Amino acid sequence: MLEQLQTLKNEAETQINEASDLKSLNDLRVKYLGKKGPMTEIMKQMGKLSAEERPKMGSLANEVRTALTEAISSKQQILETEAINEKLKSETIDVTLPGTAPSIGTKHLLTQVIEEMEDMFIGMGYEIAEGPEVELDYYNFEALNLPKDHPARDMQDSFYITENTLLRTQTSPVQARTMEKHDFSKGPIKVICPGKVYRRDNDDATHSHQFTQIEGLVVGENITFADLKGTLTVLAKTMFGEEREIRLRPSFFPFTEPSVEMDISCFKCGGKGCRVCKGTGWIEILGSGMVHPNVLEMSGIDSTRYSGFAFGLGPERVAMLKYAVDDIRHLYTNDLRFTKQFQSTETGEI
């Protein structure tokens, strides 16, 4: 048994020293020190020895087990250190290599269209008015001639937060708030109201549950329909080209009377008829009209003395028509490949 223990020790230590990875080392531990290993078998045979031999052989067996355990532990530390060093080496970053340049953002197409319209109206003497996106039901509907039982409320589904508050469905509430607090001793009202609006539409190529609007409002003495037509003509020619013609069609909006929708001559075919204008030669752009007397009175304005006009359009629609964008969702995906198509790298302009 003495020779057997010595042979086992030499053989095991040789294999432990030659182990190249932690898995191989663990296999050797199981092989020599496991429940079915030779060391266990030797310990079981101790009972067959004489009383004189048993202490000596037991002590030697324990020394061999201890030596193998220490050899495995020492080798394990070496292999773990080597593994860590190899990992660090493979993950080393060469700081002298050129870095990956971050993608540079550009001004969004929708932002550019909105700013273009804002600049145009500011040049015409308009001011920019803003209001809350979480709006009172009163300003979103009732102040705009849509009482609680008005059938026109069924024309648009809304995101209600409480019984009396909702995400505004239009920027018209800003007009109502502006009229309510305006002091005509300082001049007429002349504002545009750009901002986000929300409706319960299913998102598709032409609809979005969140989009933007720009509405305009002018209220003062002797404001006529001719003033509205002149303003819309300037808007059409500025945004779509000097050669554009406009057409006004009778329509209905609860907050204006009379109400009209404005079409422009197709910029693609020049009015001859094509896919863009659906063969009609005209493209619908916006809704407008003279401010309804009820709306003026609700805001505390004397409708026998003051009159006004209002209009509203969607910058998304303008952008899609002007730059041939076929899906409104492209405007909201934050894809730089899309955005950069509409911006000059030198001037930052469209």
UniProtKB/Swiss-Prot annotation:
Residues in coiled coil: none
Pfam families according to UniProt: Phe_tRNA-synt_N, tRNA-synt_2d
Gene Ontology cellular component annotations, sorted alphabetically: cytoplasm
Reactions catalysed according to its record: tRNA(Phe) + L-phenylalanine + ATP = L-phenylalanyl-tRNA(Phe) + AMP + diphosphate + H(+)
Subcellular location: Cytoplasm
InterPro entries for this protein: aa-tRNA-synth_II, aa-tRNA-synth_II/BPL/LPL, Phe-tRNA-synth_IIc_asu, Phe-tRNA_ligase_II_N, Phe_tRNA_ligase_alpha1_bac, Phenylalanyl-tRNA_Synthase, tRNA-bd_arm
Keywords attached to this entry: Aminoacyl-tRNA synthetase, ATP-binding, Cytoplasm, Ligase, Magnesium, Metal-binding, Nucleotide-binding, Protein biosynthesis
Alphabetical GO biological process terms: phenylalanyl-tRNA aminoacylation
UniProt cofactor note: Binds 2 magnesium ions per tetramer.
Ligase keyword on record: yes
EC number per UniProt: 6.1.1.20
Top class in the EC scheme: ligase
Swiss-Prot/TrEMBL cofactor(s): Mg(2+)
Gene Ontology MF annotations: ATP binding; catalytic activity, acting on a protein; magnesium ion binding; phenylalanine-tRNA ligase activity; transferase activity; tRNA binding
Binding site for Mg(2+): E257
Keyword field contains Transmembrane helix: no
CDD domains for this protein: PheRS_alpha_core
Entry's family note: Belongs to the class-II aminoacyl-tRNA synthetase family. Phe-tRNA synthetase alpha subunit type 1 subfamily.
Self-association state and partner proteins as the record states: Tetramer of two alpha and two beta subunits.
Protein name: Phenylalanine--tRNA ligase alpha subunit
Organism of origin: Listeria monocytogenes serotype 4a (strain HCC23)
Lineage: Bacteria, Bacillati, Bacillota, Bacilli, Bacillales
Gene that produces this protein: pheS
